[in-house]
UniProtKB/Swiss-Prot annotation:
Catalyzes the cyclization of D-sedoheptulose 7-phosphate to 2-epi-5-epi-valiolone. Involved in cetoniacytone A biosynthesis. SUPFAM superfamilies: Dehydroquinate synthase-like. Keywords: Antibiotic biosynthesis, Cobalt, Lyase, Metal-binding, NAD, Nucleotide-binding. It catalyses: D-sedoheptulose 7-phosphate = 2-epi-5-epi-valiolone + phosphate. It comes from Actinomyces sp. Transmembrane segments: none annotated. The active site is at K151. This is 2-epi-5-epi-valiolone synthase. Its EC number is 4.2.3.152. Belongs to the sugar phosphate cyclases superfamily. EEVS family.
Length: 381
């Protein structure tokens, strides 16, 4: 009589990431068609939306839904790191229960920046153990980073994204038109994540950012001029494509050496300690500046390349230094990162511009020395 069994299963994950203009234009059905397994004349949708986005686009969204005879419920969430909690997830779940969506053919729609996408994604992954959802990022950081992957999460205690899941959306709709109403600081915030990809993976993307930094800021990557449109489309294509190239073979992070973790070794601790002073991309930039100095000290990045990198950071209106970057924080962050990466540092660090390697032997003394050098280079900011 058998007393031991083994079950084995595989699941194929496919999701579409699509650039689309005018996602709230009633003539564009992409929002309702995304993730829908059944097309009906009377669709129903539960929509989680960022409070700031709702204030600007709420009327347009309602007109869109009315045009398509869609029954809907809006769940409006605050978009702040302080609100990125399980309480917000439960707010979404309460709304889902009240609205009573069909489990498979009425996908949840999440509209907002990375925070709201993470909250809604976590709720979708948990509700009835999995409910399809569609991501519609409205911030630049959402368009090139949070909106195109499969991670969900909320903060817990003093830890960023300590609770979360891997749960792919059925689709992500990228409409850069939303960037017209994003403030300047949040445009810079998103450009930090694009710069991340450039520094460790794509020298041509760095060249584009170096050549057109002011144009990218002035036109908000929305293509207001013919030249700006060409540049913005190429930047988006390289940033999103580069991100997906890294994510696709390792969606569940079975391999913990990840290029896309560049800038995310010390920044989670720095960002949470500095709340609300630093945005995510700003903390990532300080992290990248620190590791660029480390790379220079190890002979992996030339002084001239380090100067070019810092110049682009500053031209994108991003900080290269923060006064909280001291020995105690660095030691804590290194310990947390090593634990998160299963006992090895697996620290992505630039090699020149557009290349990278992983380090496992950083010491606190080396880090604090690099931080002191960074303070001297950027401490006036």
């Amino acid at each position: 009589m058998a007393n031991q069994w083994q079950a084995q299963a595989e699941q194929t994950i496919t999701y579409e990431v699509q650039m689309t203009d005018g996602v709230l234009d009633p003539s564009n059905r992409a929002l309702l068609d995304a993730g829908a397994t059944v097309r009906t004349d009377q669709p129903r949708r539960f929509i989680v939306i960022d409070a700031n986005v709702h204030e600007i686009y709420g009327d347009a969204l309602r007109k869109y839904l009315a045009h398509h005879n869609c029954e809907y419920r809006l769940c409006v969430l605050s978009a702040s790191e302080e609100a990125k909690t399980m309480e917000s997830v439960f707010t979404v779940v309460d709304g889902l229960d009240s609205f009573g969506i069909s489990r498979r053919h009425e996908p949840i729609i999440a509209i907002g920046g990375g925070i709201v996408l993470d909250i809604a994604g976590l709720a979708a992954s948990m509700y009835r153990r999995s409910t399809p959802y569609v991501r519609v990022p409205t911030s630049l950081i959402g368009l090139v980073d949070a909106g195109v992957g499969i991670k969900t999460g909320v903060n817990f205690g003093s830890h960023k994204n300590r609770l979360g899941t891997y749960f792919a959306p059925t689709a992500a709709l990228l409409d850069r038109g939303f960037l017209d109403t994003v403030d300047d600081r949040h445009i810079s915030n998103g450009l930090a994540e694009i710069l991340k990809i450039a520094l460790v993976k794509d020298a041509e993307l760095f060249r584009l950012m170096e050549e057109h930094a002011e144009l990218l800021l002035a036109e908000r990557l929305t293509g207001r001029t013919p030249t700006g449109d060409v540049v913005a489309r190429e930047v988006f294509s390289r940033a999103v494509g580069g991100m997906l190239e890294e994510l696709e073979p390792n969606l569940w992070e079975q391999e913990l050496e990840r290029l896309v973790d560049y800038g995310h070794s010390f920044s989670p601790t720095l960002e949470m300690r500095a709340l609300p002073a630093l945005l995510h991309g700003e903390a990532v930039t300080v992290d990248m500046a620190l590791t660029t100095v480390l790379a220079e000290a190890r002979g992996l990045v030339s002084t001239s390349d380090r100067e070019r990198i810092f110049q682009v950071m500053r031209r994108l209106r991003l900080p290269v230094w923060h006064p909280l970057l001291e020995a105690g924080l660095l030691e804590h962050a290194l310990r947390e990162t090593t634990r998160h990466r299963d006992g090895l540092q697996r620290m992505p660090i630039p090699v020149g511009i557009g290349g990278a390697r992983f380090l496992h032997d950083l010491t606190v003394a080396e880090l604090t020395g690099a931080a002191e050098s960074l303070r001297e280079l950027g401490g006036g900011e």
